[in-house]
Structure formats: structure tokens, C-alpha cells
Amino acid sequence: MAINNFCYMFERGHKRERPGADELYYVPGLFLKLYFQLNKNSYELKSRYALVELQDKTENTTIFEATLDNIGNEKPLAKQRFNDSEISSIVDNFFYTIVSNYSMQSFVDDNYKRQIYFYADKDDINRIEQKKEFIDHDCKAAYPHSWISPIFHKNDGYIRSLVLNPYRHNGNINLSNEFKLSKERVASLFISIDTIDIPKRYFFRPYKFSHLEIKLNAKKFQYYLDDFLREFENINNPRPIPKESLILDFLRKTNDDFGLAIQNIFKLPNLQTEEIKLNDYEKFENFCYCVAYIKLKLYKITKKYDAYKDFKEVLNLHYGENFVQIEGAASQINDLLQFVLKDPSHITKKIRRLVNFLCLAKGTYLKKITKKNFTQYFNEKSVFYNADGKTDEEPIEHRPQTADDYLSPQIYDDCLPPALFDWELYLNKIDKNENIITDEMGNPIEIPYNQMSSGEVQFLQTFSIHAYHLMNLVSISNKSGRPKYNNFNLVFDEVEICMHPEMQRVFIKKIIDLLVDLETGNNNSYNIFIITHSPFILSDIPTENILYLEDGCAIEEKRRKPTFAQNIGDMMYSSFFMEKTIGEFAEEKLKELIRKRQGKKTHMSDQEADAILKSIGDPVIRSLIEEIEANDD
């Protein structure tokens, strides 16, 4: 909550500039001091009702101070809104926190509802409790809100200091959607690791990227078109546009203003349309559907998002029996497309994927995307890659291997198959010598992501969330003018959920391998915070780095046991405060067996007693019970 309030203070007033991010809420009434160290300096983040303050205690300086406007007895400070340059100076002295927790009982919205404040602008007048309150001020919401909800959304360009994972809506995780998102994260990570020749420890071992298999799903285009026409033309049951009509319409409009602008500015492959045979649909349908989708998406963006309000009247829509036509003035269309090129937000993500896919395909009917496709593509320069400010003409493999010089997973995420396609990620397995494992016929073993076990998927989901965000964060250039974090706090809450014990055992080593890879040419700092009940994880952590809790309180130091390289079975009992070393039901049966062998009255039959005695796994316990004889007395 303290970090949320801290972020609110320096982020307020930027809603229009970051349209993809949900606005943060400020939670008043919090009195807390958070202490941390960066390098050799000690810091204090202080929250006192409506005041948030960050101090360097070593230098005895105040780095950041802000209050809510005219709230309680707080005196408003002169500074209310901070630009990105000022935010950069603030976060230089703070850290970025990435939290993962897959427990269904965690982060439920209703448990985090509080009276909150929000930053109101002219569009928020209906949400203001007292209509007389000023706009562009902190205003009290009319009813309690869940302050935790906006932190799940990661569309702020990594400005805020905190993100929670996985995404929850009203406390619920959409498992199907999370699986889809995890596949995208895992794919972009594997591709980025394999495509760029940086020193690798293969923290995803034993897996390695093989390829993506893709197939156009024309029904997805029709569904999107139906929704589009319902929204903008109020047509509830539009007729399906036949594939032939779509391609013919595309061929007719290839050289219109809109078509030329899309091809020229996005640098799409130049199709020789006069040579296209109309019965050769398969070869060109990918291109036709993608360009048609780009047109629809551009129209929708200009009508829907405030960031594109200056282009709201640029495009005009015409709908007929067998066509949907979108057109506009050439100069205005060019301005729109140039604006799209410079927009890295989620708004244009689908367009980026469509354009990048068409450039990867090079005018062919692409069914498989391999490492070779990506390497060639980025060496030839992506239009969006250039637009992101990375204009170095030197091939990727010859560049210095630092965070400022290699591409982030976000770039590769933008090159995954567009929404019109069904696709699957295939992985190879590698041995300890990094050799790909083959089957009996000598063919590489290829494992589709959707056929992996739930434990394997859980491991990749948890790991990829942190790896994905970290690799994006460290790839932000110091020259970009954007706030850049150099200190990271990784929080793995209940990390062992659904994981196989062996995956728990190697988890710490995997994290270390990841951080070693990320630190190639960098100077970042990391704090790893794990909340766990797993002795498999505890065995890799020194005792002095562990905080033991019992009933919410830290236990006495004399009760702590050495953990590093400790026997995992022994730690299950000693480090997690278990009262017994065997199950409760087994204990009851053993007590009843002992009473029977002592000749006392029980409900246990002789046959059951013999069966239980033979089933005892501990040979010492079994031997001791066998020595018990009936008491003749």
C-alpha cells in the first residue's frame, strides 16, 4: 500500500499521456515507514495519512515529498505534478517490485476496498463526491474502491514501481487467458534468448526454442468484422464477406491512398498484384486478411482512444454487400500512420504484430516461424524497431552485449503471430551439454506448449513473469528519456504452488542464472523475497537470510536450525514447526496397533493389525512395535 501511494503521488496527472494504464488510487490513513538500502545508502519511505516522503538517511536529504491537495491538516506542497525527467530522478533512488502469487485466495478485490482519493480532471466530474471540488486536484471518491486492481495492469511503460501478477478481474484469474498470455511471454523470452548471441546459462533448461507453427483462422476475422460493424454501423447480423470478395477488394484497393500509405510507411513487402491469380487464394490470403484487419483496427483506434482524438475524422467507413471500405485523405493518413509508429502502447500492439508478421513472411504463406526468420528480420531492421529509437545500423550479432544494445522481449512479443492466427509454441529438450535430445529415429524431440504438464507450465509461468518484466526493464535505454529502474525487488509469494518438488529444488539456481545473464554489461541490484512452505527451496538459503514466522510472529533465534545444504526431509519437520513427523491418521492407527499388541481392547481385527504392521515404512518404528508383547497382567 505504501508503494502504491508513492507511485500515485508522482504519476497523478498523467492519465492522458498513458491511456493504456488504469489510474492509481491513493489510500489515506496509512502511517508507515519502509526502510531499505541501495548500494551503501540507507533510505526511508514514509507514509503519513496524506503525505508521502522519500529520504536518503545516509546523506540526510529529502528526495521526494508530496501531499494530497487540501486534505485534513496537510499543507499542500508547491510541486503537484512531475514530468518524466523528474520521475527518473525519483526512481533512481527507489526500486521496482515484481510480485507473483497464483493462489486463488490471494489479492481478491473485495479484501482491498478502502475509501480512496483519485486525481480528477474535466472528464471525472461525475465521480467527484462534492461537485464544487476543483478539477486537476485530488478528490475523494463517492464510495470505496479496490485500490489493488490498477496495479495488475502493466500498460504504464514501467513508470510505476510495482506490478502484481497474474492479472485478476474481481479477484478471479482467467486461467485460459493466463495460459495464452504465458505462452506469449515464454515464446518471446525463448526467442529473445536464442536469437541474440549473448552468454547464456540457459535458465530455462532443459527447454530450448524450436519454432512456432501458425495457421490463419479466417473465422476470427469474420468475428472481428461482425463486432466492428455492430459497433460502428449498428448492423447486428452482417453477411459474411466471401474470401474471394475480400481478396478481389484488396487487389482493387492496393494502390488507393490508404493501401499505398500502409505499404509504404510500414514497409510491407511489395506484392506484384498484376501477377496474382485469383484462384491462388492460399498464397496471398494471409497478406489480404492482415491488411484488411489493419484498416479496421486503425479506424477503431481513431474513434475510441483519446490519444488519437486528433485523427478522429481522418478515416471514413463505407459498408456494402460484399465489401467494407475505409478511406481518407493521403496526407492525413500518412500523419496517422507516423503517429502509430511512435506509439509503443498496448493500443497499437495488434497492428505491430500484423506489420511485423507480414515483414517476417516476406509475401509468402508462412506456416512456421524459426530462429532464422527472426534473426534475418532484425538484421534487416523492423520499422517498429527503428521507431523505438534504436537506429544503429550494425547487425545485432556485432553489437556490444549490454542492456542498451539488445532487444527486449517486448520487441519479440510484437513479432508473435497476430490475432487472426492460431499458433503453437514448440520446444526442444536439451541435455547437460546443450545438445538437443532426439528420438529413436534421430529426430529432435519437439514438445508443444499445450502438451506440457501442469507443473511444468506453472514453473514456466512463474519464472517467465519475472524474467519477462526484468528483461524489459533492463533493456530500457538510458538515452530514451524514460524513467529507468536499476534496482529490483522480486517477490515470489507461495512460489511452490503446483510445482513438482524437483522444480522447487532447482528454483533458486534458476533465479541466479537468470540474474547472471541479465547482468551482462549492467550494474543493477536485486533483492529476492520468497514466501514459502517448501523445504526444497529452503535448502538453498542460509539461515541468516530467513525470517521464520509462527502465528504471524518471528520465532526466537535459538529455535532456528541451519538450512543451507540441509537434508530436505529433516527440514520439513524442524523448519516448519511440525508437531509430528508422521500423518495424524497414521499416528492414530499406530496407537491402536500398540494397544492391541498390549492386549488391550480395540476395534482392530487381527487381519487389519497384520496389514498395518507390514505397511509401516519406517523400519525402526516397525521393529519397536514388533517387540511389544501382550501384557499378561
Segments (PLM) and residue ranges:
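Conserved P-loop NTP-binding catalytic core
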Residues: 2-57, 90-91, 95-103, 109-111, ...
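Switch/communication elements of ASCE P-loop NTPase nucleotide-binding domains
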Residues: 1-13, 422-575
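RecA-like P-loop NTPase motor core
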Residues: 87-96, 106, 141, 147-156, ...
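Extended helical coiled-coil dimerization/tether regions that scaffold
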Residues: 115, 122-145, 149-489, 519, ...
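Long, solvent-exposed N-terminal ectodomains/accessory regions
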Residues: 40-60, 68-76, 80-84
